[in-house]
Amino acid sequence: MKTNKLTHIDCFAGPGGICTGMHAAGYETLVAIEYVKSCCETYSANHPEVHVIHNDIRKVEKKDIVDFIPKEGVDLVTSGMPCETFSLAGTTSRSFYDDRQFLFREGIRIAKLSKAKMILFENVPGITSKTVSKDDPTLIIDVLKQELTEAGYGNFVEAKLLATDFGVPQKRCVPTTHLMQYIIA
């Protein structure tokens, strides 16, 4: 597979919001991985050119993506893993510590499988203050950065960005509602 555009794999793809932004930035999304069926259906309807994998990302193997990506690898893997475990909202209605807080490892794994040149993580700012467990003060963000380095993605930049600063017409009562944490490596 040859393409003249920058190429992209969308992990934790949801209904395709990151894909839409990546297309606007000149990327060609080749593969999307999403667990929720209704999100896959919406994604496929909005982006029929993308190979959508409806599966738990932990079960996705190289054989599932290799036919859809260039042999030399992709330019970018995005990983917008579920934010519930990092969100400061609704902490009384969910388990504060669960296995979702380590799903960033799957984004790294897919980046390595696809020989990605770069990986972009996106999540709520709460990811920067979440600890591994009640008894371990190690921050999840520090574990993520360590594992990025171990995987060969040690040159990274972190940023908190407010969506409204980039033309997203979403203002709510709380001015930081759409503040998001990004790490690009």
Question: How should each PLM-predicted stretch be described?
Answer:
Residues 55, 60-63:
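Cofactor-binding loops of NAD(P)H-dependent oxidoreductases
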Residues 43-52:
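Short, conserved SAM-binding/catalytic segment
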Residues 34-38, 57:
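Short beta->alpha hinge that forms the Motif I/post-I loop of the SAM-binding pocket
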Residues 30, 75, 117:
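Conserved acidic residues
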Residues 72-80:
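Short SAM/SAH-binding signature in class I
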Residues 37-41, 62:
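Short alpha-helix immediately C-terminal to the canonical SAM-binding loop
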Residues 63-72, 84-185:
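Class I S-adenosyl-L-methionine
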Residues 1-29, 39, 147-150, 154, ...:
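S-adenosyl-L-methionine-dependent DNA methyltransferase catalytic core
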